[in-house]
């Protein structure tokens, strides 16, 4: 039996809320729902009630009745506590509402909030509660209300008029509105409104949502004629939704409305501007309190705040989304770049530079013009269309194809720190994490198919080296062939098998595990997504490894094979190529186009449906591997800023050493030490101002210098330095100058994360 709904809590608007919102669309929506719900209930009642067997994950089997027994009933039969803490069920591998009857024999798993999928269901249901509150507060028209990796949000359009038909002066959400929404949500939770599922035809959906232009667009664009989908109801809210959801709104025990912002319908600046409200929820108040404390800590470590406090970078309205890196920010940038360059040298990469701007014909060949043009900065030069490059891969194809290549040159690892531009919507810009102008540690590896496995393993080693130097963990996810794909299925199967083997080899060596993300590969090849975890235990997508069979074909890239072709081989190759293109629809599929708008995706959908001619006898087509370790320098620096909380390790620090004289007579020695340290390539400053020594030291601490050298008469006499370590309690360690320099060099060159410099020193 379903939990009973509690007493309805009336909505009382605050005295200063202004005219009431127009809620005329709600009775119409409910009337359509009630009519169809009655028909659905009658159909359910006619279903045959026959015995079924339910199998739990531990192998236990429970009896049930088809079209009557629900997962909630099963949980309740085991224990009330299990039923109370279960968020959602999984039936035969598919997420299933707890109150939805089983239709036959089934494998059933009961999932609580600790399960990642259940957590997203919990937050999705919380978003519906927020949507109901927003409708009550503003009479708004709801758009999207999805879960995210860190909670949920709802987008909605504010109404043009109020209940009296007057122009609506309340066009944007305010801080006071957040409090009001929270109060309304609290009432909805106390009402314990059941979540109800109903299947509806496209025609009925268009009638139900005829007052909501956003839902009309979604229904017409996403639901084919003659088909149906589902809506979910809680209280007066009925929303277009695939579900599933929790049992009732009372399951949301603790929540918070966090922030609000603006967004665009469908993410397009040409469409309506919407209001977006974010929230978070948990099954108990303790978890919520812990999360809110986490947010406070994260706010202190926000890279935008650190960038301002340490004078690393800034933004200006004259070029939104394009950061200005200041001298100290460039020190971090260059340290990272030099690190990558040194690894390139060890790993036989060749560095190139390609133009920033290309004729549109290049992008037509690659497919970007057809599927990525709106995200590119375009311009007209001498009556021809051009564009700033949003990625380097087509230019690298031109480099590979600039002369004849031999198998002896492969793998050819082409690297570039190219300046890229992507036309992000102004509302999507966010510090260094979402910008319009950025640089990647971008490389493309052209190799033979039998070299892919070793190249992937080499990338894992690259990741270990770089992330290990930064003290960051990473995890790997394999994304496999999507429904719509280009190329021959045998090629896909071989590629996925190669990636699996490489992942298994790496996992066995490191004692780690990798995750499978089925069907989420790019349409042009499988990929491995790499996420790193920062000090706040947040995961960030930075690195990527993607296989690409299509761009080499689009640009007709070939190399001389190792052996001359045998008789009949050329004909066989030609016949094989005839099956390369699965379908023209695959290339134009919206999913492929949408996927390539992600910042980490490189290649847009190829619209050429005719496969390039097979390579001539004696030649073969290379496989292309897109890879990056840092990804965007800008985003990676943002991640590192928050990971280290602005306390940079010595090798990466923009402020390594501060020299402070004890008295004026020591200033000459300060200059001598500064010159010696600068000659060895260190970033060293001196404070010869009029402030007291203690104030100079305090200033140096606030600016996060790794070491403060205090120099006085004794240090001059002994040619030594007294060293104060960042975050120390005031202890000084004395070392001879030459020894201090040697230890500094070791600390920098070994990319140590700690302060080993003074461990063997003598306490002053």
Which role fits each region the language model picked out?
Residues 1-143, 147-149, 155-764:
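NTP/phosphate- and nucleic-acid-binding module
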